Every structure is written in structure tokens, then in C-alpha cells.
Amino acid sequence: MSCVGKLPIIIPEGVKVGLNDLEVKISGPKGELSKSFKGSIGISLAENKLLVKPLSSSKSARAMWGTARSIISNMVTGVKEGFKLKLEINGVGYRAMMKGKYLNLMLAKSHNTKIEIPSHIKVEVPKQNIIILEGTDKEKLGQFASIIIKQRPPEPYKGKGIKFEDQFIPCKEGKKN
């Protein structure tokens, strides 16, 4: 029995859910999301609750049970409230700025890095070293954040690079003579 999968997903006011065979469509004040699931998961709507159940007792169906429930729960939260990620840039001369629909990063390379911002993600740069990402889809928001971090991941000796705001980077000790 899945500890996560057996919990019902409560649908808040202002959020509409549509079920078509293996596809779930959820719409709310912040937007609309849809996701298809394999045939091993059954999704039912009763009153204001969504229930996810495995259709068989196979190992893959049980594994997808809790995962599917978490994905649907994140979709409901996303269309109701949205998700927000803060990235922090550390390093001398490291900066970020917006230029149209591009995020321009200056990260001590021979050239500036331009990253195109997807249409479903809103990006703000309140300071040169802070990037705020907002969106309804938690998965796509995290993927875009990882694309930005990959441009200059935090290094363990001085802590320079791009990281999540609340992320701790353990610093190593330098060479001893």
C-alpha cells in the first residue's frame, strides 16, 4: 500500500478537473495543465476529491501509484497558487539581466550566455545576482532552473556559481603547503 498514493487529492474552489481515459486536465485561475498517464493507473473523481488507484498489483503499477498522485497534486497546486523558485548568483562580475524574451548571463566566460525563456515561465531579475522564476508546471520550472544552473554550477572551493537560494554548498579546504 502506497503511503502517498492512497491519500485523496482535495480539489479547491476555482479549480476544474476533466478526466478523459488516461488524460487529466486541470484548469484554474493561473492556467491550465494536462498530463497523460499509462494504463496501469486509474483516476476517479468523487465530489471534490481525486482518487488514484493502481489497476493491477504489478510492481510497475504500484511504483507509479504514488508518483501519479504527486504529479496530479502538483498540477492542482500549480493552477491554483503557482510555483516560485529563487536562484542566487555568487561570484565577482557574475550578473544576470533580462533582454526581451532572453535571460542574459555574464558568468566570467569569453561571451555572455543568452537563454530563451519558455512562454509558460515568468522570469524576474530584481537584482543583478537574484533570478526569480514563476510558473504553473513544477516539473518544467525545475528543468528550466537546472538549465540556468548548468551554465555555471557552484564550485566547492569558493562557492562561486549559480545555486538555489536555500541550497547549502559545503566548501572544501584549499591546498596546504
UniProtKB/Swiss-Prot annotation:
UniProt organism field: Rickettsia bellii (strain OSU 85-389)
Q: Which keywords fit this entry according to its UniProt record?
A: Ribonucleoprotein, Ribosomal protein, RNA-binding, rRNA-binding
User: PROSITE patterns given for it?
Assistant: RIBOSOMAL_L6_1 (PS00525)
Assembly: Part of the 50S ribosomal subunit.
Cellular component annotations (GO), alphabetically ordered:
ribonucleoprotein complex; ribosome
**KW Transferase (keyword) present:** no
Name the Gene3D superfamilies for this protein.
Ribosomal protein L6, alpha-beta domain
Lineage here is: Bacteria, Pseudomonadati, Pseudomonadota, Alphaproteobacteria, Rickettsiales
| BP terms from Gene Ontology | cytoplasmic translation
The domain of life for this entry's organism is Bacteria
NCBIfam families the record matches: L6_bact
Pfam family membership, one: Ribosomal_L6
Query: Family per UniProt?
Result: Belongs to the universal ribosomal protein uL6 family.
Q: Does the keyword Ion transport apply?
A: no
Q: What is this protein called?
A: Large ribosomal subunit protein uL6
What are the protein's GO molecular function terms? rRNA binding; structural constituent of ribosome
Tell me, what does this protein do in biology?
This protein binds to the 23S rRNA, and is important in its secondary structure. It is located near the subunit interface in the base of the L7/L12 stalk, and near the tRNA binding site of the peptidyltransferase center.
Enumerate the InterPro entries for this protein: Ribosomal_uL6-like, Ribosomal_uL6-like_a/b-dom_sf, Ribosomal_uL6_a/b-dom, Ribosomal_uL6_bac-type, Ribosomal_uL6_CS
